[in-house]
């Protein structure tokens, strides 16, 4: 049977771009593949950029990411959900992969080029990031990897590393296949300036207080053609229209689109209708998240169980890897 693996950055509370772009897909895949689907909060990846993480908050953000995923419906009793640093085999396999991967292949990664340009002295962890990512995936012999399109190059390198290892030490790893969520939309930031991103500060968090969400929507830009209330607009050129596609039922969507094009409704009324449906959609998630935070032992026990399940697979694979590489076994 196929096995799914996906890494989740410990960014704390995810935003609606994460939710519609990836998290809902995790739930669907979890229902399809059960315990053959593994989801890992990749806290080791988080520290590859020393200036981009806070050691005082990393543990809490890791915990919060587990809460958020459980709250949207990812059931830890039906999938394997764990924390990367709790399974030391990730680091061990990553080191072995760095020994078979030419530096040039790591240096040509587009993300490395983009991120390294920010540093006067580039941390080596940033360069080795793809080798660790390859270890994350291949350690579980996963063949399905749901990722964003920005990770395509890393998946191709993972496949190349698998081929190199198999050539050098014997057939061991399958070459994983990247799976993209074709239904995922490119969700614009609430400021209208490109894609929603925490680094840009233009997000709507799925666990954000509704009052804060409304304040963001209230001042969010709309179709610039609607200078006056009586001016018709084009909802396809308005980020509020984009958000309605995510949250509103068909009848509301029809009302909004017709009302915008005929100036039958104003932008404020359109935003209020959107806020109603955002609240309806996110309130059960926020309620469940509050319950989980009130019962941290449940979350920690679920993570411990996931750690054990992941290690059971990882230790078996690493025994095979060590034997093929030639390490002494006592």
From Swiss-Prot:
The keyword ATP-binding applies. SUPFAM superfamilies: Nucleotidylyl transferase. GO terms for molecular function: ATP binding; tryptophan-tRNA ligase activity. It catalyses: tRNA(Trp) + L-tryptophan + ATP = L-tryptophyl-tRNA(Trp) + AMP + diphosphate + H(+). Its main location: cytoplasm. PROSITE patterns: AA_TRNA_LIGASE_I. A motif ('HIGH' region) lies at residues 10-18. Its EC number is 6.1.1.2. The keyword DNA repair does not apply. It is found in: Cytoplasm. InterPro entries: aa-tRNA-synth_I_CS, aa-tRNA-synth_Ic, Rossmann-like_a/b/a_fold, Trp-tRNA-ligase, Trp-tRNA-ligase_bac-type, Trp-tRNA_synthetase. Keywords: Aminoacyl-tRNA synthetase, ATP-binding, Cytoplasm, Ligase, Nucleotide-binding, Protein biosynthesis. L-tryptophan binds at residue 136. GO terms for biological process: tryptophanyl-tRNA aminoacylation. A motif ('KMSKS' region) lies at residues 195-199. ATP binds at residues 9-11, 17-18, 148-150, 187, 195-199. GO terms for cellular component: cytosol. Homodimer. PANTHER family: TRYPTOPHAN--TRNA LIGASE, MITOCHONDRIAL. Belongs to the class-I aminoacyl-tRNA synthetase family. HAMAP family: Trp_tRNA_synth_B (MF_00140_B). Catalyzes the attachment of tryptophan to tRNA(Trp). This is Tryptophan--tRNA ligase. It comes from Deinococcus radiodurans (strain ATCC 13939 / DSM 20539 / JCM 16871 / CCUG 27074 / LMG 4051 / NBRC 15346 / NCIMB 9279 / VKM B-1422 / R1).
């Amino acid at each position: 049977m196929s096995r799914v693996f996906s890494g989740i950055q410990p960014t704390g509370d995810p935003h609606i771009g994460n939710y519609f772009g990836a998290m809902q897909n995790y739930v669907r895949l979890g229902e399809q593949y059960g315990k053959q689907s593994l989801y890992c909060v990749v806290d080791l990846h988080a520290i590859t950029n020393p200036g981009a993480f806070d050691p005082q908050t990393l543990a809490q953000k890791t915990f919060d990411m587990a809460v958020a995923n459980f709250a949207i419906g990812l059931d830890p009793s039906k999938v394997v959900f764990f924390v990367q640093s709790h399974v030391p085999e990730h680091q061990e396999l990553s080191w072995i992969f760095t020994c078979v991967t030419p530096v040039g292949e790591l240096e040509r990664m587009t993300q490395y080029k983009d991120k390294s340009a920010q540093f006067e002295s580039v941390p080596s962890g940033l360069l080795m990031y793809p080798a660790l990512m390859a270890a994350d995936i291949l350690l579980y012999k996963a063949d399905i990897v749901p990722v964003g399109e920005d990770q395509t190059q890393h998946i191709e390198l993972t496949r190349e590393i698998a081929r190199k290892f198999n050539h050098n030490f014997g057939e061991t790893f399958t070459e994983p296949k990247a799976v993209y969520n074709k239904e995922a939309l490119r969700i614009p930031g609430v400021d209208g300036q490109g894609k929603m991103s925490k680094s840009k500060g233009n997000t709507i968090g799925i666990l954000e207080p509704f009052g804060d969400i409304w304040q963001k929507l209230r001042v969010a830009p709309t179709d610039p053609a609607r200078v006056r209330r009586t001016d018709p607009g084009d909802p396809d050129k308005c980020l509020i229209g984009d958000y309605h596609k995510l949250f509103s039922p068909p009848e509301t969507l029809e009302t909004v689109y017709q009302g915008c094009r005929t100036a039958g409704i104003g932008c404020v009324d359109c935003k209020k209708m959107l806020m109603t449906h955002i609240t309806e959609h996110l309130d059960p998630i926020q309620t469940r998240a509050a319950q989980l935070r009130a019962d941290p032992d449940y979350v920690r026990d679920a993570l411990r169980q996931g750690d054990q399940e992941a290690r059971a697979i990882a230790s078996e694979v690493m025994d095979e890897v060590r034997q093929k590489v030639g390490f002494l076994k006592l």
